[in-house]
């Protein structure tokens, strides 16, 4: 397990406080698990940096990492972006497309600004987080992701 000092050195982090060191030590501890992690905090406090630290210290470190700002994705396309879509499922869907969850399978996805998502998308997201299952837009087939 990495100590706060080791993590700071490895990732070029600066700062000194007991709370900061505890947060870094917690990141190292959760990186050793295969659990979904919720990182909370105000905008600009480094949630994405912590997610990258957790990914880099985890067994998933050799797989993809993707950070998604959910607040920047238009409401009409967010389900397609996250879960993918089938050819012909809407105007302009000329081919099947993998969503972020499918393309990062086995890796790490960091979802920022999830509170900005439409409520129906949040319920789809909850299903993915609970069971790893999702359905592409325009499909009736359930798929799984890790």
Predicted feature descriptions by range:
Residues 12, 25-91, 102-118:
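Conserved post-Walker A coupling segment in P-loop NTPases
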Residues 64-66, 96-106, 110, 118-124, ...:
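AAA+/SF3 P-loop NTPase mechanochemical coupling elements
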Residues 31, 118, 129-130, 137:
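Protein kinase-like catalytic domain
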Residues 20-24, 75, 94, 98, ...:
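Amphipathic alpha-helical transducer elements in NTP-driven molecular machines
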